[in-house]
Structures are given as C-alpha cells and as structure tokens.
C-alpha cells in the first residue's frame, strides 16, 4: 500500500512539473522510459509507465546472493550484474 501511494505521489509530481513546461504542439521527447508528446494547447502529455531503476555498476562473486536494502540479489555469471527481487523497501 505504501508503495502504491509513493508511486501515485511520484506520478502526480511528474505531471505537475510537466504541466509548467511549455512546448511546441506535436513536439515529442523521451523522459526515462516514457514518451511525451506536446498537446495542441502547448502542454506536455506523457505516458506513465513504471520505469525500471537505472542500472549501476557492481562487482560481486558469481552465483552468490546478497542484500540490497530489503531485496535479495543473485550475482550473475560475469560478476558485474545481478538479478534482484523488486520489493518496495520502507525508508531505511
């Protein structure tokens, strides 16, 4: 439930910020994994996909598991990538 509320708040913030930014009708831009198109009234309208967090470089022992906040990750065979659960962790 907390995750859903946080997600709604984030979407609302993005929409409010975008509403203040004027644009040329028909203009298109990318914002993270979302596509934004300028409406005929000169206001951005964007898709609201839940984007994956940005990837970061890691170094780990291949095959080993480790914690990332409240999520459990398993190190990839290359020692530079990992697959993690996607729990919404409470503020830590």
From Swiss-Prot:
Disulfide bonds join 23-38, 33-51, 36-46, 60-75, 70-89, 73-84. It is found in: Secreted. It holds the Pfam family Pacifastin_I. Residues 20-54, 57-92 form the Pacifastin domain. InterPro entries: Pacifastin_dom (IPR008037), Pacifastin_dom_sf (IPR036201), Prtase-inh_pacifastin (IPR016307). One of its GO terms (molecular function) is serine-type endopeptidase inhibitor activity. Keywords: Cleavage on pair of basic residues, Disulfide bond, Glycoprotein, Protease inhibitor, Repeat, Secreted, Serine protease inhibitor, Signal. The record marks 48-49, 86-87 as: Reactive bond. Brain and fat body. Both LCMI I and II are inhibitors of chymotrypsin and elastase (in vitro). They both inhibit the prophenol oxidase activation cascade. This is Protease inhibitors. The lineage of its organism: Eukaryota, Metazoa, Ecdysozoa, Arthropoda, Hexapoda.
């Amino acid at each position: 439930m907390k995750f859903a509320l946080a997600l709604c708040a984030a979407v609302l913030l993005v929409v409010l910020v975008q509403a203040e930014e004027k644009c040329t009708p028909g203009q298109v831009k990318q914002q993270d994994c979302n596509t934004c198109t300028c409406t005929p009234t000169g206001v951005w309208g964007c898709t609201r996909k839940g984007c994956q967090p940005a990837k970061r470089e890691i170094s780990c022992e291949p095959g080993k598991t480790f914690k990332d906040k409240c999520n459990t990750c398993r190190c990839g065979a290359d020692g530079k990538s990992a697959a993690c659960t996607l729990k919404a962790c409470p503020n830590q």
